[in-house]
Regions:
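Extracytoplasmic ligand-binding site segments that recognize negatively charged/polar headgroups
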Residues: 1-143
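A ligand-binding cleft/hinge motif common to bilobed small-molecule-binding domains
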Residues: 2, 154-171
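Periplasmic-binding protein-like
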Residues: 46, 72-85, 115-125, 166-190, 204-218
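A bilobed periplasmic-binding-protein/Venus flytrap-type ligand-binding module shared by bacterial periplasmic
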Residues: 49-56, 91-92, 183-197, 213-216
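Short amphipathic alpha-helical coupling segments at ligand-binding clamshell hinges
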Residues: 63, 117, 193-205, 213-214
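Loop/turn elements at helix/coil->beta-strand transitions in domains of secreted/extracellular proteins
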Residues: 73-76, 130-131, 149-152, 169-172, ...
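Short, hydrophobic alpha-helical packing/hinge segments within bilobed ligand-binding/sensory domains
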Residues: 142-145, 198, 211
Length: 218
């Protein structure tokens, strides 16, 4: 975003720089439109959510609040080792609204008091004798921790959970309440020695066939 504002990376003209979809839909309408800037073209859209091992729980978790409910759902939880997404799910589970606007989570997190509130929620979970936390850093870890029985619930990426459940037959069930959408995208540095070829490569990497093919691996 800063690079775009400072003119370091190229601002795309989507209908000129990228091909239309096979059905003729212009690129400007075909791409996910909520990119962070006009200098970004997305290649992956995925969810941060949580999942559970259905063999280890007697009841069915359905909400973010259930992730923190160790009385009804005892057992350890796996959470990301960074504050990323942890603050959001903690506040959402504590009753703060999700979405856009002054009364919603990201606006509230500008206030240190809400950061403390989220951290206290996480700390309580990790120190709960009926709960406890295992921290993960690699995307493969959450389903592995669930499958091994080390944890009963884990935050993670929807594609990893899906692969474990469908591809490996693991008893892993995803919960979508409070999911956070995330994406990855490309940018093109302005004024490079091979900018025309780089733009062609970028258009090829983000065409419909290539992006659809990435679903085999995500």
């Amino acid at each position: 975003i800063n690079g775009c504002d400072e003119g370091i990376v190229v601002e795309f003209d989507f209908d000129k720089d990228f091909p239309p979809a096979p059905d003729g839909t212009p690129a400007r309408e075909d791409f996910f439109t909520d990119m962070p800037s006009k200098c970004a073209v997305g290649n992956i859209l995925y969810s941060w959510n949580y999942a559970y091992n259905s063999d280890l729980l007697k009841s069915t978790p359905k909400t973010l609040k259930d992730f923190f409910n160790t009385k009804r759902f005892p057992g350890k939880r796996a959470i990301y080792k960074s504050a990323l997404t942890n603050l959001e799910i903690a506040l959402a589970a504590d009753g703060v609204k999700m979405g856009k606007g002054g009364e919603f989570i990201y606006k509230k997190l500008e206030d240190p008091a809400y950061v403390d509130r989220a951290m206290n929620k996480i700390k309580a979970l990790c120190e709960d004798p009926n709960g406890g936390c295992v921290f993960w850093s690699a995307g493969a870890q959450p389903p592995e921790l669930l499958m091994s029985g080390e944890v009963v619930m884990a935050t993670g990426w929807n594609g990893r959970f899906f692969n474990a459940a469908v591809g490996e037959g693991a008893p892993i069930v995803q919960v979508w309440d409070g999911q956070g959408l995330d994406y990855e995208y490309f940018a093109l540095v302005k004024g490079g020695p091979n900018q025309a070829d780089a733009m062609k490569a970028l258009a090829m990497m983000t065409n419909t066939e290539m992006l659809a093919g990435s679903a085999k691996y995500i």
